[in-house]
Structure formats: structure tokens, C-alpha cells
Regions:
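Conserved adenylate-forming
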Residues: 1-37, 146-149, 154
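AMP-binding/adenylate-forming catalytic core of the ANL superfamily
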Residues: 45, 50-51, 80-167
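Conserved C-terminal "lid"/linker of ANL adenylate-forming enzymes
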Residues: 101, 128, 160-203
């Protein structure tokens, strides 16, 4: 995403506790910088809105999207996006908080760390989703004109590259989807991952 600009402050806040004992209303910074310090991208400043209009405030999280710093009493908007700040103070996006996938072995994966790489390498559209018991990292591949067997072989050969980038040995499983991905009615671009997850678990 780049660096923050004048008038807008950005912090990477903690967004959950391993035991789920977590107060979302408190602004607590993630310690450290870099890929191992992923948290919720949060913003504060005069141009940051204080609430959404009418029913949208409740529909999109309401008070859960706000955190308060008890030291300086500033208010921070939790964007719902996860990311980190590197040593050069650049902000990196890894995906939406609700789209992260927590595998049964304790490893957490984020869409933006995987999908853009596969999409650009093979000219396809992919979606990381929650699968049965999350025993594997399930990647759904949207319908395209490529031969699936050939494409699947290429995807499997890319696993070592992905594992190296993620610095983890991940058991990936690639699943073909015979149609176009379901998308939101507004932007016609945001993948409805929950539907893909249900489809996968019912296969």
C-alpha cells in the first residue's frame, strides 16, 4: 500500500488473543515489524469518518470497528484489513480479517500472500477458503479455458515456491470450480468466499 500521508495516522493493532479473551475496544499495537507482526490496519485523523450512515453502521460492525487508546485518548478506526509495517515504514496488505484461514496445525494463511502470485503466474483466478477441518490449504480455481490436468500439475509444481515465500511447509490442495466465482452485488468483484467454502465442504 505504501506509506501513510500527512494528516492520517496508521497503526497495526492486535485483533485477537489466542484464547479469544480480547477487548476489541482497546488500541494495542502489535509488537515488532515485518511479516511476523501482522495485525489490523487501523487509522486515525481528521479525515477519518466517525460513523457510517443509518443502518450501515450496525451492518458493518458498529462499535467493533473502533478502538480507543487509553493513554492519549485517541480513537482509531479498525479497517478490517490485516497487514504489517516493514522496517522502511511501508504498509503491506495481506487480506481481510474475516478471510484469513487458520489451519488445524496452527498456521494462519492470508489471501493476498497467495492468490496474486498464482493468478499472475498462471493467468487464472483463485480463492483461498476455509475447507473441511482446515486440514489443508484449499485453493479454489475459477473456471477457465485451460486444461485442468495440465494446470493442476503446474500448480502443484508451484508449491515449493509458495512454501518458501510463506516460510512454512504447507499442504496445498487445488480444487477446480466449474463456473465463475460468485461475487458481491455492488462491486461485482469481491469474491463471496463463504459460498465457496460451503460448496467445498459439501463436495
Amino acid at each position: 500500500l505504501g506509506k501513510s500521508f500527512s494528516g492520517v495516522k496508521i497503526r497495526i493493532l492486535t485483533f485477537r488473543h489466542p484464547l479469544e479473551e480480547f477487548d476489541n475496544s482497546l488500541a494495542v499495537d502489535v509488537t515488532g515489524k515485518g511479516i511476523n507482526s501482522i495485525g489490523e490496519i487501523s487509522v486515525s485523523g481528521p479525515v477519518v469518518y466517525t460513523r457510517l450512515i443509518a443502518g450501515d453502521e450496525k451492518a458493518f460492525g458498529g462499535s467493533l470497528t473502533w478502538a480507543r487508546d487509553t493513554n492519549d485518548r485517541t480513537t482509531w478506526h479498525r479497517t478490517g484489513d490485516l497487514g504489517y509495517i516493514d522496517v522502511e515504514n511501508r504498509i503491506w496488505l495481506v487480506g481481510r480479517k474475516k478471510h484469513r484461514v487458520e489451519l488445524s496445525n496452527g498456521v494462519t494463511l492470508y489471501p493476498k500472500q497467495i492468490e496474486p502470485i498464482l493468478d499472475s503466474m498462471f493467468d487464472i483466478r483463485t480463492a483461498l477458503v476455509n475447507g473441511p477441518n482446515n486440514s489443508q490449504a484449499f485453493i479454489i480455481v475459477e473456471n477457465n479455458n485451460q486444461n485442468w490436468k495440465i494446470l493442476e500439475d503446474k500448480l502443484k509444481h508451484s508449491i515449493p515456491t509458495l512454501c518458501k515465500l510463506l516460510k512454512n511447509n504447507i499442504d496445498f490442495s487445488f480444487v477446480p470450480f466449474s463456473q465463475s466465482f460468485p461475487v458481491d452485488s455492488g462491486h461485482q468483484a469481491k469474491i463471496r468466499r463463504e459460498e465457496l467454502s460451503i460448496w467445498l465442504c459439501n463436495k
